[in-house]
């Protein structure tokens, strides 16, 4: 099992798709990392040699990408800053509402939580 940046990569996936399990690496950046590290894109995680894993580690360390904990901390601090300056986006984050202008009269259930049932009036 290959472990990079504190993440266990899945064993039987191709290395480009396995790298996407690291927070902050998408498929495009994974392919660039593999190209820089001179690894065959068809290689599965199980078949990586120790030299290839070392090359991957060095490539990730030398890249200017924010990964895993650093990226999560960076995003958390940005949201915290928005809350502190009391801007519209900060208020939306604080109230667990959609931030980017989506409608909330209907839909937005994934952001607002499960449906709240309202009982009708009894006569």
Swiss-Prot record:
User: Could you confirm whether the keyword RNA-binding appears in this record?
Assistant: yes
What UniProt keywords are attached to this protein's entry?
Answer: Chloroplast, Plastid, Ribonucleoprotein, Ribosomal protein, RNA-binding, rRNA-binding
- Cite the PROSITE patterns for this sequence: RIBOSOMAL_S13_1, RIBOSOMAL_S13_2
Region annotated Disordered sits at 89-123
Which terms in the GO cellular component ontology are assigned? chloroplast; mitochondrion; small ribosomal subunit
One GO MF term on file is: structural constituent of ribosome
Feature: compositional bias, Basic residues: 102-123
A Gene Ontology annotation in the biological process aspect, one of them, is: translation
**Main site of residence?**
plastid
The subcellular location is: Plastid, Chloroplast
Q: Which family does it belong to?
A: Belongs to the universal ribosomal protein uS13 family.
Q: What does this protein do?
A: Located at the top of the head of the 30S subunit, it contacts several helices of the 16S rRNA.
How does this protein assemble?
A: Part of the 30S ribosomal subunit.
Q: Which NCBIfam families match?
A: uS13_bact (TIGR03631)
Protein name per the record: Small ribosomal subunit protein uS13c
């Amino acid at each position: 099992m290959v472990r990079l940046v504190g993440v266990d990569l899945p064993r039987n996936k191709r290395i480009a798709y396995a790298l996407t399990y690291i927070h902050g690496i998408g498929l495009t950046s994974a392919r660039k990392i593999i190209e820089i590290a001179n690894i065959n894109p068809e290689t599965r995680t199980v078949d990586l040699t120790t030299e290839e894993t070392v090359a991957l580690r060095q490539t990730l360390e030398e890249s200017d990408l924010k990964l895993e904990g650093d990226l999560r901390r960076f995003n958390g601090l940005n949201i915290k800053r928005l809350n502190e300056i009391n801007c519209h986006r900060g208020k939306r984050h604080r109230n667990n509402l959609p931030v980017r202008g989506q409608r909330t009269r209907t839909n937005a259930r994934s952001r607002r939580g499960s449906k709240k049932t309202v009982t009708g009036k009894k006569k």
